[in-house]
Amino acid sequence: MTTCDVAIIGAGPYGLSAAAHLRTVKGLELRVFGVPMSFWNRNMPAGMFLRSAWTATHVAHPAGCLTLEAYQAASRQQFSTPVPLDQFVQYGLWYQRQAVPDVDQRAVATVEPAPMGFRLYLEDGEALVSRRVIVAAGIGAFAYRPPQFFGLPPSVATHTSEHSDFRDFCGKSVLVVGGGQSALESGALLHEARADVEIVTRAPRLHWLQGWLSHALHYRLGAFIKQLLYAPTDVGPAGISQLLARPEIVRRLPRDLQDKLRKRATRPAGARWLVERLKGVPIRLRRSVVSAELAGEQVKVHLDDGSERTVDHVLLGTGYKIDISKYGFLAPELVQSLRRSNGFPVLKDGLESSVPRMHFLGAPAAWSFGPLMQFVSGTRYASRSLLRCITGKAAGLPQP
């Protein structure tokens, strides 16, 4: 049976960055599984823009050289800001070709304990044993669907992650549920696709990002103040951004304070550049969906104010709820062995779980290391921490 030292499950930003860092270890037998950038390419809508700032959109590389600027130069194209989804996907694929050209695009069907570490079964039945497993499988398995919509067929109710193009909704009535970036940008894209859109959110008001300075003050003081109040990682509001950029500090804070920081940093909010695009889209605040049922080929939705809507489709911009038991490739005995909190794995140094030599990167690491792990800008910390854990040495790598 084939063996390796490390198997990485997932070929998105976290999996690719981890692989690039581990490839610097001489003699390490590394395998990477997954379709590169697949979630970004297949489960996010065409026309989307990344909410994160330019400085927070690089996939970390051990030499700090595979940046957005490097891709612009190599591809002879100029990125706009905010960064369009399609350009970021192409950047990720370029990163993969440069740093991790030998990705195995087969899916991992099962991971189970083995005497020498872990036994992996691939989708075609091939098996291998790896001494260490890095789970960088993203958030696709965690799409949250409120119970009010259980039982409704996908013809009338879907999560935003189930779409890569909203043009099919042209001429249809769509109710969008949610008040964060996903819901608001989906509402804008649907409106631009000539759908009849309404957004419903339980929030008393919408929160908009990057609105903390007036335009006049921005040009006078913006750059200086931003350097003081905001880390390049671009996670969290002024005052806590610099703290959240340091997961090694965050993880040592009292648990209740960590939870408050994570809640504040990741509360539903939209990028300010959506404001103009949402003009003409009705947005109902302080409203929740009580129930929903089929009405012929449509869906009837009941709100908590007693009103009803009968629409062609309900789009759930309701985010993601981490629960690693929903990673279908993890054998039940592994899941049972993992120490968890609210669905998150409890991790220690190197993002290692309670199962020795099994690590979790990306959003599942947020409970232990803070909300930075939910964003691309967290790849730098995660990859360096992982490398340090495996080699027993400080990374000693250049700044990005």
Each model region followed by its residue ranges:
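Charged, glycine-enriched surface loops/patches
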Residues: W40
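Flavin (FAD/FMN) cofactor-binding and adjacent substrate-gating region
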Residues: M44-S75, L228-R251
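Flavin (primarily FAD) cofactor-binding/catalytic cores of flavoenzymes
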Residues: M1-M37, Q77-Q181, E185-P400
